[in-house]
Amino acid sequence: MFDIGFSELLLVLVIGLVVLGPERLPVAVRTVAGWIRTLRSLAATVQNELAQELKIQELQDSLKKAEEAGLQNLTPELKASMDELKEAAEALKRSYHSDIGLEAPHTIHNPLVTEPEAIHDGVTPAESATKAQASPQAPATDVDKTVTPTAVETASNNNEKPIVQVETFSASISSVDREPVPVTNTPVTKVQTATVDTHSTDSHGADQPRTHQPGGDR
């Protein structure tokens, strides 16, 4: 490995014996021998890896050459079948594109929505226009008025004054667009006139005994 002859090795041993002495020389020889072994093992592993990589590269090259040769030497039957498959695939593509071209003119695309209110409600301008035409126009004003009835209760056969009950109802006015308007019912006021029984007071005064006080000396 290092191209060292016997004379050179003997010279190295003599120098080591003089420098290290007889006690350290065997230890030095062992360490040097261990280093030589490790270096030889590393060199062997590197050579083996390089050889394997070269073999793998050669195999790959040979496989590529074999595939190219096999494709060139195909039988005419295989070539015909491959051509038929290609033609069928192209026919399917042409039919698909023709169907798409026929369906394209019949499709109706919605126009772009530019109004923010229509975008928020999710209604296109065309739909809003049709809804506006279809909806009938409401009358300008619809006023529903209710009559305020007055109830008059007459008293019985006795001489009582009539009791009058007045109930008022509010009028409901509907808006122009027929939107629901909240109707506030005003509280019902009942006016009752106090009854004065004059007849009973007169009769009560008549029933009381009249006391005659004697006057003074006449």
From Swiss-Prot:
One of its GO terms (biological process) is protein transport by the Tat complex. InterPro entries: TatA/B/E, TatB. The keyword Cell membrane applies. It is found in: Cell inner membrane. Residues 199-218 have a biased composition (Basic and acidic residues). Residues 126-145, 174-218 are annotated as: Disordered. The keyword Acetylation does not apply. One of its GO terms (cellular component) is TAT protein transport complex. Gene3D superfamilies: 1.20.5.3310. Part of the twin-arginine translocation (Tat) system that transports large folded proteins containing a characteristic twin-arginine motif in their signal peptide across membranes. Together with TatC, TatB is part of a receptor directly interacting with Tat signal peptides. TatB may form an oligomeric binding site that transiently accommodates folded Tat precursor proteins before their translocation. This is Sec-independent protein translocase protein TatB.
